[in-house]
Design a protein with these regions (language model features):
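Residue-level signature of catalytic and energy-coupling elements of molecular machines
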Residues: 18, 53, 75, 145
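Conserved acidic residues
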Residues: 51, 113, 143
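Active-site-facing substrate-recognition patch
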Residues: 1-52
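Charged, well-structured alpha/beta interaction segments
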Residues: 50-66
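Short, glycine/charge-rich flexible loops or terminal/linker lids adjacent to PRPP-binding catalytic cores
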Residues: 74-116, 176-177
Length: 180
């Protein structure tokens, strides 16, 4: 068991009966918890050679930025569509009830670049899968995905077969488990 797990607050029956909400804000509010989360996520990168960390809006920023800083690597934000001011590349993807788009500054990701994608959560894998495709469209290679939490019962990892995927804390639950 990761030491980070003690800082995650589990709230039963929220937002509705049968769901266990995994609240990571309790990790962020505690200096020791935050340090552990960033350190353990960084350890998951191991000896992987890479050029930049790509963080997904918004909680991927919370962990990706300090990881990039500690490793002296670039940080590249992937945002919801319409949030970046320079020329972007974007990709649409399906959600459970609709669709969404994410984008990145086109010039920030260059052909041949090797990146690690960081987010807070592997759930269904849809956003992470879209981010992998977005990076690959620009000629870069995703060499690893690192997240704080994984909800194994939602099988998101099954969509992320093109590169190694790591999570610090995994919950076995199927539906009825969520995280924010």
């Amino acid at each position: 068991m990761s030491k980070v797990e003690q800082y995650i607050t589990s709230i039963p029956d929220y937002p509705k009966a049968g769901i266990i909400f995994r609240d990571i804000t309790s990790v962020l509010k505690d200096a020791d918890g935050l340090r552990l989360a960033v350190d353990e996520m960084t350890e998951k990168i191991g000896d992987t050679e890479f050029d930049a960390i790509v963080g997904l809006e918004s909680r991927g920023f919370l962990f990706g930025m300090p990881m990039a800083y500690n490793l002296h690597k670039a940080f590249i934000p992937v945002r919801k569509s319409g949030k970046l001011p320079r020329a972007t590349s974007r990709i649409a993807y399906d959600l459970e009830y609709g669709s969404a788009e994410i984008e990145v500054h086109r010039e920030d990701i260059t052909p041949g670049m090797r990146v690690v994608i960081v987010d807070d959560l592997i759930a269904t894998g849809g956003t992470l899968e879209a981010a992998v495709h977005l990076v690959e469209q620009l000629g870069a290679k995703v060499v690893k995905i690192v997240c704080l939490l994984e909800l194994k019962g939602l099988h998101g990892r099954d969509r992320l077969t093109s590169c190694p995927t790591e999570a610090v804390v995994s919950y076995e639950g199927k539906e009825g488990t969520t995280a924010h």
